[in-house]
């Protein structure tokens, strides 16, 4: 699963998820899956969506993952009283803003790519839309 190799600090504050995304265009592939809402995508969810897409296209073409889980989420163990410091890092998340491109695909038929993105969007906790590359 995806997570940073090393970070400056082990734990991070929760923060807020406001504003719009900057990476909102199809940059690498021909067709992309774009987030409509905002959420926190865990590394497990990203991997699950990637596997669903890869299996559907039968390892043809190329898939780009445009998000990376770089924010640690901590959790205290069960049945532990409050206080005594912050819990240990449980998993990693990527903060998703509206308009952010999640996945891109190239080298497969458009109908197959749309079906693969539909499978992947079922694994994600955010509404998505499919965007095609516009040639200038």
From Swiss-Prot:
It comes from the Bacteria. Keywords: Ribonucleoprotein, Ribosomal protein, RNA-binding, rRNA-binding, tRNA-binding. GO terms for biological process: translation. The keyword Cell inner membrane does not apply. Gene3D superfamilies: Ribosomal protein L10e/L16. One of its GO terms (molecular function) is tRNA binding. InterPro entries: Ribosomal_uL16 (IPR047873), Ribosomal_uL16_bact-type (IPR000114), Ribosomal_uL16_CS (IPR020798), Ribosomal_uL16_dom (IPR016180), Ribosomal_uL16_sf (IPR036920). One of its GO terms (cellular component) is cytosolic large ribosomal subunit. Binds 23S rRNA and is also seen to make contacts with the A and possibly P site tRNAs. NCBIfam families: rplP_bact. Part of the 50S ribosomal subunit. Belongs to the universal ribosomal protein uL16 family. This is Large ribosomal subunit protein uL16. It comes from Vesicomyosocius okutanii subsp. Calyptogena okutanii (strain HA). The gene is rplP.
